[in-house]
């Protein structure tokens, strides 16, 4: 016994140790949706306890030196294996043999130095192979010959001196070949012959010290759509040579960023004449001279980036030939400002005249003095123009500033950060289709008469935030009734309290920002007519006096009529009162921000109409009490609540309801444990609100409600019981009558046997008068009923006992008329009852009906007749009623019993 116990303890200890080992090993990796993440775990070997059905395994940033094929036998379903950022120096060919479904293999940032013919011989299903940042200096033989499905191959940041990756045509499905940051000096046709049947979407040779492009080097590639040669330090001569080598190829995208291409001429891109080049990136080249006709051979170009250059001048023929250009970026493309005015960049009139299909023009962050009368002439398709921080001398916008855009269908104009101080009347009269006008972050200080916006008949948004000073008038926005968004944040706004309101014409306005203006005086009709307003930002003003009861004329309800308001921000307004009815009829409010005010006691029912509220912010106020009368309605559908940093009074009267709500709600309450603290009473100071014990709170309201509900339920129950006791039989009678009038009395009997009598009646001799008196009329009323009565239906000349047996067999049912006489009748007790029961037992049928004319206890019934009420279904047990009015109900129940099916037990 002792040995057995020791063995069990040893086994249990071993299993426990194994379980701990498995859990600790598995728990290091995160497994989710067949993806195992084992990165950053300092692993030195492949985990062997992961689920066998994983399809993705991440082993990056560990200390692996090898990928032993046998360790992957368990994971034969792997499709993606990422082993980057390890110390792997050799890859065994059998790895892909073990992983036949492998499609993506990432080995970047390892220590691979050479690749043999056998390395990837079994990796026939690979679509992506990443060998970036290894120590591969030379590719020998044909290591990628079997990779017929490979789409992307990354060999960037190695030590390769040649583009030759094999002999003979291979990699037929390759689309991306990345060879950036190697030591390739020349592109030779014989070294690119292996790509003879490839259609390269992208060939990246960036950051290589290229010095030579041999004749036909790109012609040997099947198809080449995109070539990246960024940071290759190509001089103008090499660039021109490159373009000639790309002639008659499929090239569409050419990136030559950061190549110190100081100047371009008509011959620079002439070799691209016989291509369909659509994208050209010349950014970061310190380009200072764009010669006339530089792009004349690029009629298919749609995207041109000249960002971050040092262009001194654009002439009328600088963009000649770009008849299909859609996107042009000149962000920070011009010479930066210096002391000498002569060094300012110059854009001649009609410089953009050839760009008739240009839709997007970005000229941000330049130092152009200002616009001229024909600066943008010819841009007849321009829709987006960004001029942020573009001009140095555009302090005043006049009706001549944008005259060159008169024929442009401009939709968006960005003029931020240009030191604009004044907008003259009719400045934008040329821009009838403009939708968005951004004048923010300037130095505008003026009174808005409304004529500034003349001609903006389709304007959707005007952004004027972060300017110096704006004074409104009643007609400030009278000419832009289509306006839907108006931003006036931090503009030292004046004259807001005039009547009629400056915003009255803006019937379509949905967003209005008046924040950070120190507004103290407004009228009740400030927002009159803005029925479509959805967002109102009024934070960081000084509205405290306007909502005080002591305010002359009473509180100012400037929110009335905003029936579609969704978001209201009144943060930091010094509010210490909220008048009753100020939020009335604002049924669609989803978010209210009243944070950083001085609110303390809130009136009951002020939020009653805010049952759709999703977010409520009351942080950093002086709220001590959170009561149901105030916060019950808005808390119903709340998703987010912020009441941090309030001095809560932790008493039953003040916060018991709030604490109960907190402990039951799913609403997001950030920093509940740390920033919802009790302030009073003293012994609760600093105590977390959610830990306040409400069990001792004696709130009578719930008990009153419980008393009312329980009392009502008890009264209803008593009434129902009395009704059933007094009139239950009548209810049952009418119910049964209704049911059987619809469905009929007889149930479907599946037995094929036919009976001559509906029922054989067993009764005592002394009860024969009662039987004849009540069963005979039933036969007369219902012709389908026929009872077997001894005095009438026994065959003449047949012995009595034999007649009884025959009659019972020919009857569908057997009725017992039970009285004290029956219990004493010797014939019934000895023969009739026993034979009837025996037949019922033999046939296994519910064919017996008991009619009690007298109240006979069950034990007497059992003793005399060997019967009990529990042997029969309830509808087969009938009691003769004392009251005459219940006789009809009795007859109905008897008909139901007679019509019931003789179902087997």
UniProtKB/Swiss-Prot annotation:
Residue span(s) of domain LRRCT: 646-699
GO cellular component: cell surface; early endosome; endoplasmic reticulum membrane; endosome membrane; plasma membrane
Signal peptide extent: 1-25
Record has DNA damage as a keyword: no
Topology, Cytoplasmic side: 727-905
Positions in the Lumenal compartment: 26-705
GO function terms (MF aspect): double-stranded RNA binding; identical protein binding; pattern recognition receptor activity; transmembrane signaling receptor activity; ubiquitin-like protein ligase binding
LRR repeats: 53-74, 77-98, 101-122, 125-146, 149-170, 173-196, 199-220, 250-271, 276-297, 300-321, 324-345, 357-378, 381-401, 409-430, 433-454, 458-479, 482-502, 508-529, 532-553, 564-585, 588-609, 612-633
Topology term for the membrane: Single-pass type I membrane protein
Domain of life: Eukaryota
Cysteine-cysteine disulfides: 29-38, 96-123, 650-678, 652-697
Residue intervals of the LRRNT domain: 26-52
Transmembrane regions: 706-726
Family, per entry: Belongs to the Toll-like receptor family.
Domain comment, as recorded: ds-RNA binding is mediated by LRR 1 to 3, and LRR 17 to 18.
PANTHER family: TOLL-LIKE RECEPTOR, TOLL-LIKE RECEPTOR 3
Described purpose of this protein according to its UniProt entry: Key component of innate and adaptive immunity. TLRs (Toll-like receptors) control host immune response against pathogens through recognition of molecular patterns specific to microorganisms. TLR3 is a nucleotide-sensing TLR which is activated by double-stranded RNA, a sign of viral infection. Acts via the adapter TRIF/TICAM1, leading to NF-kappa-B activation, IRF3 nuclear translocation, cytokine secretion and the inflammatory response.
Protein name as it appears in the record: Toll-like receptor 3
The organism of origin for this protein: Mus musculus (Mouse)
């Amino acid at each position: 016994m002792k040995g057995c116990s020791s063995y069990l303890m040893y086994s249990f200890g071993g299993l426990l140790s194994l379980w701990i080992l498995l859990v600790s090993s598995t728990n290091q990796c995160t497994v989710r949706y067949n993806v195992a993440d084992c990165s950053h775990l300092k692993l030195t070997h492949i985990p062997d306890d992961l689920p066998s059905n994983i399809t993705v395994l991440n082993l990056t940033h560990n200390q692996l030196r090898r990928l032993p094929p046998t360790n992957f036998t368990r994971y034969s379903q792997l499709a993606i294996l990422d082993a980057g950022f390890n110390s792997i120096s050799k890859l065994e060919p059998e790895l892909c043999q073990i992983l036949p479904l492998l499609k993506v293999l990432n080995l970047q940032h390892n220590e691979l130095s050479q690749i043999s013919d056998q390395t990837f011989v079994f990796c026939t299903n690979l679509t992506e192979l990443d060998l970036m940042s290894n120590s591969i200096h030379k590719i020998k033989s044909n290591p990628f010959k079997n990779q017929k499905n490979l789409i992307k191959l990354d060999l960037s940041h190695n030590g390769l001196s040649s583009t030759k990756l094999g002999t003979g045509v291979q990699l037929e499905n390759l689309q991306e070949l990345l060879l950036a940051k190697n030591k390739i000096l020349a592109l030779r046709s014989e070294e690119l012959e292996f790509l003879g049947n490839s259609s390269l979407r992208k060939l990246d040779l960036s950051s290589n010290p290229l010095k030579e492009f041999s004749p036909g080097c790109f012609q040997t590639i099947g198809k080449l759509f995109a070539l990246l040669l960024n940071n290759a330090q190509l001089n103008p001569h090499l660039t021109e040579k490159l373009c000639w080598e790309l002639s008659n190829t499929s090239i569409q995208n050419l990136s030559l960023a950061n190549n110190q291409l100081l100047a371009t001429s008509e011959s620079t891109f002439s070799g691209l004449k016989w291509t369909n080049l659509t994208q050209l990136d010349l950014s970061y080249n310190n380009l200072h001279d764009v010669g006339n006709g530089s792009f004349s051979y690029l009629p298919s170009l749609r995207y041109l980036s000249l960002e971050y250059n040092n262009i001194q001048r654009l002439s009328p023929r600088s963009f000649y030939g770009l008849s299909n250009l859609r996107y042009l970026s000149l962000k920070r493309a011009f010479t930066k400002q210096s002391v000498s005015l002569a060094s300012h960049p110059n854009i001649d009139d009609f410089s953009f005249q050839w760009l008739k299909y240009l839709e997007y023009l970005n000229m941000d962050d330049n130092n152009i003095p200002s616009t001229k009368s024909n600066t943008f002439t010819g841009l007849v398709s321009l829709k987006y123009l960004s001029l942020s921080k573009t001009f140095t001398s555009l302090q005043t916008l006049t009706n001549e500033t944008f005259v060159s855009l008169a024929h442009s269908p401009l939709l968006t104009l960005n003029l931020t950060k240009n030191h604009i101080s004044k907008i003259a009347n009719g400045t934008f009269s040329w821009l009838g289709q403009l939708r968005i006008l951004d004048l923010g972050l300037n130095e505008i200080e003026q009174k808005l008469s409304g004529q500034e916006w003349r001609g903006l008949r389709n304007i959707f948004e005007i952004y004027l935030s972060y300017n110096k000073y704006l004074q409104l008038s009643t007609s400030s926005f009278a000419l832009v009734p289509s306006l839907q968004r108006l931003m006036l944040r931090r503009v030292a706004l004046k004259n807001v309290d005039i009547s009629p309101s400056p915003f009255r014409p803006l019937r379509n306005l949905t967003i209005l920002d008046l924040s950070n203006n120190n507004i103290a005086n407004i009228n009740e009709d400030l927002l009159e007519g803005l029925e479509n307003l959805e967002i109102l930002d009024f934070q960081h003003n000084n509205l405290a006096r306007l909502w005080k009861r002591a305010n002359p004329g009473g509180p100012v309800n400037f929110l009335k009529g905003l029936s579609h308001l969704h978001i209201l921000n009144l943060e930091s307004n010094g509010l210490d009162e909220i008048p009753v009815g100020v939020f009335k009829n604002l049924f669609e409010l989803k978010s209210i921000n009243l944070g950083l005010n001085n609110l303390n006691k809130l009136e009951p029912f002020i939020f009653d109409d805010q049952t759709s509220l999703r977010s409520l912010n009351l942080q950093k106020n002086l709220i001590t009490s959170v009561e149901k009368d105030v916060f019950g309605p808005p808390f119903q559908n709340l998703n987010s609540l912020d009441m941090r940093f309030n001095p809560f009074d932790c008493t039953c009267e003040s916060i018991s309801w709030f604490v109960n709500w907190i402990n039951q709600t799913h609403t997001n309450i950030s920093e509940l444990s740390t920033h919802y603290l009790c302030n009073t009473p003293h012994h609760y100071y600093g105590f977390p609100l959610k830990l306040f014990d409400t069990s001792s709170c004696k709130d009578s309201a719930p008990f009153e409600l419980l008393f009312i509900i329980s009392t009502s339920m008890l009264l209803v129950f008593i009434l129902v019981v009395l009704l059933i006791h007094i009139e239950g039989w009548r209810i049952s009678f009418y119910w049964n009558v209704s049911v059987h009038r619809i469905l009929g009395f007889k149930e479907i009997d599946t037995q094929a046997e036919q009976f001559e009598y509906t029922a054989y009646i067993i009764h005592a001799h002394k009860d024969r008068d009662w039987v004849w008196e009540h069963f005979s009329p039933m036969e007369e009323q219902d012709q389908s009923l026929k009872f077997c009565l001894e005095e009438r239906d026994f065959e003449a000349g047949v012995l009595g006992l034999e007649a009884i047996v025959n009659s019972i067999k020919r009857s569908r049912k057997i009725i017992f008329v039970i009285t004290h006489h029956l219990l004493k009748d010797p014939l019934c007790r000895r023969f009739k009852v026993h034979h009837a029961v025996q037949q019922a037992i033999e046939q296994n049928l519910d064919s017996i009906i008991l009619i009690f004319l007298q109240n006979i206890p069950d034990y007497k019934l059992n003793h005399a007749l060997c019967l009990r009420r529990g042997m029969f279904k309830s509808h087969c047990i009938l009691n003769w009623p004392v009251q005459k009015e219940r006789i009809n109900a009795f007859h109905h129940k008897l008909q139901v019993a007679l019509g019931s099916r003789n179902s087997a037990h």
